[in-house]
Amino acid sequence: MAPGANIHIPPAGPPEPGPLYSDFYQQQIERQRNNNYHSTSLRNMVATSVNRTALHPGGVQPGKGHTELEEELHEHAHIDYDRVAIIANPSVAALYEDALVYETGTAITSSGALTAYSGAKTGRSPSDKRIVKEESSEKEVWWGPVNKPMTPDVWRINRERAVDYLNTRNRIYVIDGFAGWDERYRISVRVVCARAYHALFMRNMLIRPSAEELKHFHPDYVIYNAGSFPANRFTEGMTSATSVAINFAEKEMVILGTEYAGEMKKGVFTILFYEMPVKHNVLTLHSSANEGQNGDVTVFFGLSGTGKTTLSADPKRALIGDDEHCWTDRGVFNIEGGCYAKCIGLSAEKEPDIFNAIRFGSVLENVVFDPISRVVDYDDSTLTENTRCAYPIEYIENAKVPCLSDSHPSNIILLTCDARGVLPPISKLTTEQTMFHFISGYTSKMAGTEDGVTEPQATFSSCFAQPFLALHPMRYARMLADKISQHKANAWLLNTGWVGAGATTGGKRCPLKYTRAILDAIHSGELAKAEYETYDVFNLHVPKSCPGVPDELLNPKNSWTATTSFSDEVNKLAKLFNENFQKYADQATKEVIAAGPVVQ
């Protein structure tokens, strides 16, 4: 080398792109953007390629390693991780960004919550629920209208259909979480979905693992949500383009033909209704639960729309959970990491805890908002009556976290929403009456909680959970009877429905302030000491007075204003109770049967 010659030292990083390379680079960036990929992934790819030439400016990309999660998805579901961007356990902010960019109907509301649209299905589709009929669970499952059987062959067809759909997406989301706050019984759940809205929903509803727990997370159950794509209608047993199917042997759930996020939540619930009693002798409950300052626990049974979420959000008591629980030999634990509250008619005055929980990180579902101010109109039911919000349970100021109690319930409240207006607002139940009304599960099907329901309809739902049950109702009922007997709990029938008359004959919904006053009297012990009278036909024990509640409201006969005969209406409902109970009478004791109404 000649003295004084300049020595060229190449840069440590990749060389500066020449014009041809630069054009290629920009073209690929644009192509990735059009295909909804993250352009940062391409920059990394181009920067790490080797053997770049003028003819082949992209060079050769070394084979990249895959994460443990990606390898599991590839092995079990054949997810093409080299083509599909697998976004695993993303942050709330990242899910907001993707939902806003890629999902129609998504916006940030004035409170900071994300609002999403679930499409044509704005409620659950119970008629499309299927359980795979296979050897390991066949003798346990309660087969019939609630749990329709699906053959393993049809399962495989629809499962592959869901996986094929997910493989056509440019990005899919994976959310890992736990169901059950008691570590002795919790199950690990993985959700694989195509919508950021669904991912954020389940991030809120499952119990969020720590960073350390996520490192080597292995799911017990996997949910494949391909809800944007229809089921194969021509396979055996399919009645529509919607399919919500669970396979207890494969430990998987597949959703097709519905984007309603509540299907995932209730699918996990059905899994727990199977796993807990069968494998652990633990009772699963469709209930909310809270705890007083003295450690006393109250459990609220009830169907959607009867007030479980609203009534358990009590500023004077710590919230254990609003919808799904298990009762063990040690106490009660919440299944979920979040709450899924109805929003229709919501206001800061009536339900401040829920109203204030709707903020950044929460997911509003099918609400209507002002396009300028982004303020949500909670009274607007244009899209559905079943407007909802999913938020982490920590958003409730007085939530008890971890969400479990070492105390056994001292008060068990069976919630009902009587559209006929003939059941008392509150009744004290004997053990036998508790069994009768638990097995009956009477309420009125509330507008919007299921697809196609717009007016209240009288219905019976065994264990207040019939759409979610996996086993025969009497199996849960016997377990509850044992718990009540063992722990000497007080039981109450609380009607949050109509008073004065029926829903169609001029009655009005029982004001929330009176329902809360009744609960306060239960928790203080005053109501248990009150003077009672017998309410005819149903033979219920009704208090003559309750602090904060008008006396005439406590006995429906005294507050009846409808032109129809009160006696006729009571007896009509009594007949419906007795007709429904015939389905379970062969497995019920004489004492429980006698605890039902006597038609006069």
Curated annotation (Swiss-Prot):
Classification via Pfam families: PEPCK_ATP
Reactions catalysed according to its record: oxaloacetate + ATP = phosphoenolpyruvate + ADP + CO2
A GO term from the CC aspect: cytosol
Highest taxon in the source lineage: Eukaryota
CDD domains xref list: PEPCK_ATP
Binding site for ATP: 302-309
GO biological process, one term: carbon utilization
Pathway(s) of this molecule: Carbohydrate biosynthesis; gluconeogenesis
SS bond list: none
GO molecular function, one term: phosphoenolpyruvate carboxykinase (ATP) activity
Enzyme class: lyase
Entry similarity comment: Belongs to the phosphoenolpyruvate carboxykinase (ATP) family.
Protein name: Phosphoenolpyruvate carboxykinase (ATP)
Source organism: Emericella nidulans (strain FGSC A4 / ATCC 38163 / CBS 112.46 / NRRL 194 / M139) (Aspergillus nidulans)
Upper taxonomic lineage: Eukaryota, Fungi, Dikarya, Ascomycota, Pezizomycotina
